[in-house]
Regions:
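Structural beta-alpha unit
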Residues: 1-2, 16, 70-102, 139-144, ...
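Gly/Ser-rich helix-loop-strand patches that form or flank binding pockets
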Residues: 93-143
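General small-molecule cofactor/ligand-binding pocket signal
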Residues: 36-38, 78-82, 133
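Short, solvent-exposed amphipathic alpha-helices that sit
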Residues: 23, 53-67, 89
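Short glycine/serine/threonine/alanine-rich loop segments
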Residues: 27, 33-34, 75, 99, ...
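Small/aliphatic-rich secondary-structure junction motif
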Residues: 2-55, 140, 150-155
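Short, well-ordered secondary-structure micro-motifs
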Residues: 20, 47-50, 89-92, 114-115, ...
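Short, conserved glycine- and acidic-residue-centered signature motifs
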Residues: 17, 57, 117-121
Length: 155
């Protein structure tokens, strides 16, 4: 059994990503683990509602990130904003900080869409030095329902 003391929850603020949050919180409570909530900011991608100015955008994303808080105040939470390629930064951050488990959502893209856009979750599963739990929101399910779960472990 893997001892889980540090959990990383990377988010892109989508309903798919939010779905994994329930699992990250539950696991943090169960194992008495700390939780790091990570958003990787990509400056060359325009996001509706986010400022165009790079410095203002960083402030905006940091504010969005810090709004994510577990109801249980006993869970130690750290918010981290990084810049770069999401999959690479998630993997690097997990390795550099000794994360035991990454809990993340997936959009569940298939076919041409996946080929063109790639899969952050797939790259993290492939490259992470720790175990990864991927939560997929079933089609047509409201975001309050828990989704399907896939786990890949590393020793």
């Amino acid at each position: 059994m893997i001892r889980v003391q540090k959990i990383l929850y990377p988010t892109d603020f989508s309903s798919y990503s939010n779905q994994a949050y329930f699992h990250a919180i539950s696991l943090a409570e169960k194992h008495g683990a700390s939780l790091t909530i990570l958003f990787v900011y990509t400056p060359d991608i325009v996001t509706p509602g986010a400022p165009d100015n790079e410095e203002q955008a960083k402030v905006y994303w940091q504010q969005q990130l810090e709004q994510i808080r577990p109801l249980d105040a006993r869970i130690p939470v750290r918010h981290v904003l990084l810049e770069g390629d999401p999959a690479s930064e998630i993997v690097r951050f997990g390795r550099d900080t000794g994360i035991d488990l990454i809990v993340m959502g997936t959009h569940g893209r298939t076919g041409l869409e996946r080929l063109l856009l790639g899969s952050v979750a797939e790259q993290v599963l492939r490259d992470a030095a720790c175990s990864v739990l991927v939560v997929k929101l079933p089609k047509g399910q409201p975001t309050t329902e828990r989704g399907d779960v896939a786990v890949a472990g590393r020793n």
